[in-house]
Amino acid sequence: MRFDPSEIGEVLEMLLFRELDIRAVTLSVNTLPAIRPTVGDTLAALEETLEPLLKRLRPAVERVASRLGVKIVTVRLAVSPISIMLEPIGKAEAAVEIAKHLDGLAEKHGVDMVGGFSAFVHAGVSRGDAALMEALPEALNSTRRLAGFLNVASTATGVNMDAVRAAAEAVLKMEPHAAARFAATANMPEDVPFMPGAYHGLGLPDAVVNIAVSGPGVIEAVVRNMPNADVRTLHDAIKRAAFKITRLGELVGREVAKELGVPFGSVDLSVAPSPKVGDSVAAILEAVGLPRVGAPGTLFALALFVDAVKKGGAMATSTIGGLSGAFIPVSEDVVMAEAAREGALTFDTLKSTLAVCNTGIDMAGIPGDAPPDAVAALIADVMAVAVALDKALGVRLVPIPGAKPGDVYDLGGLYGRVVVMDLGKYRDIPLARRKGTAPPAVERLKKG
């Protein structure tokens, strides 16, 4: 990669004054060689597989950050789906032991999060899947760095309503900090660097580095400096800023991969917000011209923003991966959270944004006593969109015990302040109790 002086100068300004950083360096490692018939042997094999890379990961990231003068917010690990590793064991207690062991390894080596406590159950549930699903609440409640998901739908197979219900019931048994590390998903790609969707895909090499970028403050500044620009000019300016953000992401990823001696994988183009003021995707949408995110025009502003980010990112790198859409977690974006607290942002609004490249309903609070029917039905709605439009989508809900709509619960760190949102008045939804798998949409026929 070659950079001209003006590009370097612009990126330096972004780094120094616009909160530009790299959200995550995610090392993805194949842990399937650690499959063993007993949990004790599995734990030992996991350690043997992971430690040679883990002990070098944090130092490598810090060397690259220091050398380039770039802030890297989190260092993460993604492992092969743990449900596969549970196939020969088939016990929930083993899943919990593996979860705690991975959490301990992450803490030991300065890794902020571990992804891959996951199962793909969009077409049915295997022995290992069942063990992981049973263990999910206890495993996540008893850890702090582990993340996972249940992939409950796919364009190829449709929506597994049994798995949707299981995901809803699991979430409602989780403490807030645990639910923030779990999602129900559809069509989850193999190279996602963001949590809780990260895992090591079956088509990847033994180890690979994937990058999650950030920098909404950069794009907000660009938009606010153009109050009278027409929308095409505004789109072009956002696209150019996204190009620079993505180029930085690829540079960091390649340098870390070189330090570790593993291949570089991909850059997720999603511009990730954080709870800090000046680091908000929703603020970009309001700078485009919304009085408040959630107002009429929100979908247009979001579509304009995401299209520009994708086009700028696609020009910057040929290694596009992950979700690469609009990443707008409600609690992790201070402006989104405020809009939700005011009632400007509702679940209906969030569902409508799925059509223009939002990556799901993310980090939204719900009352701790929310009815399972309502939670399952909400997940099913999102999965239906994912199947119909062939999109990768997720639902990450955070139940807050004793809370009512409008209440706020501070999770701290990157998770921010969770606003409890109204799921609606319907507690009894028979549809959410129907079993079986809804067939895939006609979109499936395009794959033939």
UniProtKB/Swiss-Prot annotation:
Domain of life per record: Archaea
Pfam families found in the cross-reference section: DUF711
PANTHER family: UPF0210 PROTEIN MJ1665, UPF0210 PROTEIN SPR0218
Family: Belongs to the UPF0210 family.
Protein known as: UPF0210 protein Pisl_0759
Biological source species: Pyrobaculum islandicum (strain DSM 4184 / JCM 9189 / GEO3)
